[in-house]
UniProtKB/Swiss-Prot annotation:
Statement: the UniProt record of this protein carries the keyword ATP-binding: no
Domain of life assignment: Archaea
SUPFAM superfamilies in alphabetical order: P-loop containing nucleoside triphosphate hydrolases
Signal peptide (residue range): none
InterPro entries, sorted: G_ENGB_dom, GTP-bd, GTP-bd_ribosome_bio_YsxC, P-loop_NTPase
CDD domains: YihA_EngB
Family recorded in the similarity comment: Belongs to the TRAFAC class TrmE-Era-EngA-EngB-Septin-like GTPase superfamily. EngB GTPase family.
HAMAP family: GTPase_EngB
Protein name: Probable GTP-binding protein EngB
Job of this protein: Necessary for normal cell division and for the maintenance of normal septation.
Keyword terms of this UniProt record: Cell cycle, Cell division, GTP-binding, Magnesium, Metal-binding, Nucleotide-binding, Septation
Length: 209
């Protein structure tokens, strides 16, 4: 795989973007999925620009983490969010898939915290935004290895509800993929990605996913 400088220069026609809060494991997931050598920051929010990896006409994009960024002022955080939205709007036609990566154990509490302030959590806002601009979106519910097996189903139900999806979560297996990137357990996500590629008649990309 080659790191892409700009999609325009590379003749890209098919893009998959990965979005999520800082430190939810996006870069680790990309490495596990594609073997991509994407820089992984030790502190939340180290990545401030999109990181691209290209193979054939497929572009894989790791968008900057939104939300808390260590050592980054609030104003700059807003700029990163605005640039992310602008990037998605500008390239919506070629962005065929969006993967929203979340920290599963923390997600319900994060959403509830923002709800208590009468504010829309940025994760939920991003999920809704991607779908509004017509981008098929998958939820990569990461860090499930930190969840007790007995609480697995109830947590995924809570995640679905907070995303505006009625429980039980099993009704949304075509959208929600429980994974653990660090443990290499990403089978559910790979399955959903391949399902989407097949629907788009891009089985030729299976060898990269």
């Amino acid at each position: 795989m080659e790191t892409s400088k700009t999609a325009a220069e590379s003749g890209v026609s098919f893009e998959i973007i990965f979005v999520g809060r800082s430190n939810v494991g996006k870069s680790s997931l990309l490495r596990e999925l594609f073997g991509a050598k994407v820089r992984v920051g030790k502190r939340p929010g180290v990545t401030l620009r999109p990181a691209h990896v290209q193979v054939s006409d497929l572009l894989i994009t790791d968008m900057p983490g939104f939300g808390f960024m260590s050592g980054v002022k609030d104003r700059k955080q807003d700029i990163v969010k605005d640039k992310t939205v602008h990037y998605i709007e500008e390239n919506a036609e070629r962005i065929k898939l969006g993967v929203l990566v979340i920290d599963s154990p923390a997600f319900p509490q994060i959403v509830d915290r923002w709800d208590s302030k009468d504010q829309i959590p940025i994760d939920v806002e991003m999920f809704d935004f991607l779908r509004e601009v017509g981008i098929d979106t998958i939820i990569a519910a990461n860090k499930m290895d930190k969840v007790k097996e007995s609480e697995y189903g109830s947590l995924l139900d809570e995640i679905a509800i907070r995303l505006g999806l009625e429980s039980p979560w099993q009704n949304w297996k075509h959208i929600i993929a429980p994974i653990s990137a660090k443990k290499g357990d990403i089978k559910a996500l790979k399955g959903l990605l391949r399902d989407r590629l097949h629907e788009m008649k891009r089985d030729d990309l299976f060898k990269y996913v």
